[in-house]
Design a protein with these regions (language model features):
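DNA-dependent DNA polymerase catalytic subunits
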Residues: 1-242
């Protein structure tokens, strides 16, 4: 009621005055209330999160998260991490920093047990011909997911697996995952279509620590910086001498 009867008419009056001042043909600016939220975090232009209580005039029984430009709603983030980032944001909105520390620690343990298919980055693969190199598999400056795709295709040929696994083609939807340095292929990444071929024998070389950092902690970093929180307890002099 306050928005409809007080705030919106005042804003419309100001817009009319602005249109008149700037000699506009007509005032085309219209403001309507979108949400009422009790908490919000803005980290950059068009990147924010709100704890919504009222959505376009509908009072919600339980608060709802509204996310804009956040990794939790981006398809380039693994699904399991998107869900957990949303959980973490709910903790940030309604609980204490120690509760976030527990969520991160618990998810880290779970993450380390997940298969490659659950924690890999989804991407679209383009420009395979552009970055292919007959002598070195790929050229310098190749995007990491394309690099992984070219390594995958090379190994499929080398191991004679063409009849079992399709080669990655231009425009295919793929996943890529980081590998530890000491792996049989000698490259730090591998891409694949739906399942990482067991014949590659790379499961023990998946770099879970890097994947956790890149898929979960890094997307959370700008949110935590905005509220001055950390993702794990920090050692302090007070605690050391206490």
């Amino acid at each position: 009621k306050v928005c409809d009867n007080k705030i919106e008419p005042y804003i419309e009056k100001c817009f009319d005055e602005l249109a008149d001042y700037s000699n506009a043909f007509k005032n085309a600016m219209v403001m309507k209330r979108e949400v009422i939220a009790n908490k919000g975090i803005w980290v950059a232009k068009k990147r924010y999160m709100l704890n919504v209580l009222d959505d376009e005039g509908v009072r919600l029984a339980d608060p709802k998260l509204k996310l804009m430009g956040i990794e939790a709603v981006k398809s380039s983030t693994p699904q399991v991490c998107r869900g957990k980032i949303k959980e973490a944001i709910k903790v940030i909105m309604g609980k204490e920093e120690k509760d976030l520390h527990k969520l991160v620690a618990d998810f880290r343990k779970e993450f380390m047990t997940l298969p490659a298919e659950s924690i890999a980055f989804p991407r679209s693969c383009n420009n395979l011909k552009k970055y292919r190199d007959s002598a070195n598999i790929f050229i310098k400056g190749t995007p990491i997911h394309v690099k992984g795709a070219l390594v995958y295709n090379y190994q499929i040929h080398r191991l004679g697996l063409q009849s079992k696994y399709p080669l990655i083609q231009e425009g295919d939807k793929i996943k890529f995952i980081k590998l530890k340095a000491a792996n049989p292929f000698k490259f730090d990444v591998i891409s694949y279509m739906t399942t990482l071929p067991e014949e590659f024998k790379l499961q023990e070389y998946i770099d879970y620590d890097i994947q956790f950092q890149k898929t979960f902690l890094d997307p959370m970093r700008f949110i935590l910086d905005a509220v001055n929180w950390k993702d794990e307890p920090q050692a302090t002099l007070e605690a050391f001498f206490g």
